[in-house]
């Protein structure tokens, strides 16, 4: 959904963009439609069966079609301006690290890559002088709010969570739920994997870990707060008594658009009705209902091993569930 949203944004300003590369796993039909529309010459299709189907079709003989991300060195002859890395799961880490040296700016929407490989990503960003922008709505909001602000002024950062589809359900009722219920998020249109992570609240645990790594803030300065409407994306309390609250509509177009244009272009999107601010609802995150948030108290400050294991275990459980 991140990729489709970005494509739709670029369609509105097509004359100012040249897309050099598109990639997909199994959804090659959608990829080919996009490639045809934008006249994209380079495609990466990681699913072996999908790759063979396209490669053997003479209709696409004028395209450069690859099966893995080691082809970057063949595709890029100079640094491109912008890259979106939104490959789901830990498999997104390697291509994210590889692409950094070929791009001036990278927007990353892959939690697992940041959690498991931030040290490698950051080292690469510094080496190749590549600008980084987080695309998760919470991290983009924090990043935006902290521009030109010293980190030592921060007292606490609250990451908001909607509570997912089961906020009003008792823990007993959660013992018998199906895939459709789990993936039916009340506020966001997302893929099945991230919707499942949202329902269990492990998604928010991952976001706290991300924030710790990206903004170099200790876990004791980060907290989860339930905000069912999802209008507030981050709350930052400062030691000088002031608090910053970042509010925007529940539309991933907003962080994606601003990552692309660096907040220098006006967005054509649904404007937030400020009447909603009359009824903002905040609640504490209940560890009895969402026991996975207890994991945050177990995480050591200075190692990624536990976090990497957590990501791997969650990936496997979600795969088995779906």
Go through each PLM region and give its residues.
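Catalytic, metal-anchored helix/loop core of enzyme active sites in primary metabolism
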Residues: 1-322
């Amino acid at each position: 959904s991140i990729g489709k949203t970005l494509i739709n944004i670029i369609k509105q300003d097509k004359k100012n963009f040249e897309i050099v590369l598109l990639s997909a796993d199994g959804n090659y039909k959608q990829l080919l439609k996009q490639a045809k529309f934008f006249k994209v010459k380079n495609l990466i299709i990681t699913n072996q069966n999908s790759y063979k189907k396209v490669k053997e079709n003479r209709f696409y003989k004028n395209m450069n079609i690859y099966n893995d991300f080691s082809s970057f060195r063949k595709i890029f002859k100079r640094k491109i301006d912008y890259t979106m890395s939104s490959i789901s799961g830990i498999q997104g880490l390697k291509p994210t690290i590889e692409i950094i040296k070929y791009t001036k700016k990278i927007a990353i929407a892959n939690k697992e890559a940041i959690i498991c490989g931030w040290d490698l990503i950051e080292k690469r960003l510094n080496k190749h002088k590549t600008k980084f922008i987080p695309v998760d709505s919470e991290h983009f909001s924090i990043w935006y709010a902290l521009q030109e602000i010293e980190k030592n002024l921060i007292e606490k950062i609250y990451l908001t969570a909607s509570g997912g589809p089961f906020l009003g359900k008792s823990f007993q009722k959660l013992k018998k739920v199906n895939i459709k219920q789990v993936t039916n998020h009340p506020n966001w249109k997302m893929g099945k994997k991230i919707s499942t992570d949202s329902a269990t609240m492990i998604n928010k645990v991952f976001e706290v870990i991300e924030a710790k790594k990206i903004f170099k803030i200790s876990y004791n300065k980060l907290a989860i707060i339930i905000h069912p409407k999802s209008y507030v994306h981050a709350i930052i309390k400062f030691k000088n008594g002031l608090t910053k609250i970042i509010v925007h509509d529940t539309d991933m177009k907003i962080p994606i658009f601003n990552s692309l244009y660096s907040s220098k272009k006006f967005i054509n999107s649904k404007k937030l009705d400020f009447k909603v601010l009359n009824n903002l609802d905040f609640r504490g995150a209940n560890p009895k209902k969402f026991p996975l948030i207890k994991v945050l108290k177990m995480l050591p400050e200075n190692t990624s091993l536990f976090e990497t294991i957590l990501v791997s275990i969650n990936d496997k459980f979600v795969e088995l569930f779906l």
